[in-house]
């Protein structure tokens, strides 16, 4: 015949097991958060090789991790590998269209490449994902200001250039310097 521990002992053991599982989960999550913090810090400090090594290590164990892939794109861009960074972000936007950050970051790279139409489309997708995403709203405003500046400058260079076009260009230019 088997004997079972008293009910109190069983519930105490169960509680200890639950606490142990919760503790392990907390440790795993905090360790994972530390990886992101470490990579972010390395990027901020310009230590792109070390950041790349840590992001590669994380992506080997979790290749679809969107947060680390976003950080990876920043590393690649900082290393002058903008084409690869664009590829990472384009892939992220296809796999995770609900995340606004990859759309926004992709728009920044597109704008830097002179692909204004693509940048605007990407920012609009970011805003579809999260309409109150202020970074994307500001970036979209900056793109439109830049386009307005170009148009006013062109208008100011025509033979019958209205003075208002030059005034508007002069008013917009300092806004884009900030």
Residue ranges of each PLM-predicted region?
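Helix-start (N-cap) detector for alpha-helical repeat units in TPR-like alpha-solenoids
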Residues: 32, 66-67, 100-101, 134, ...
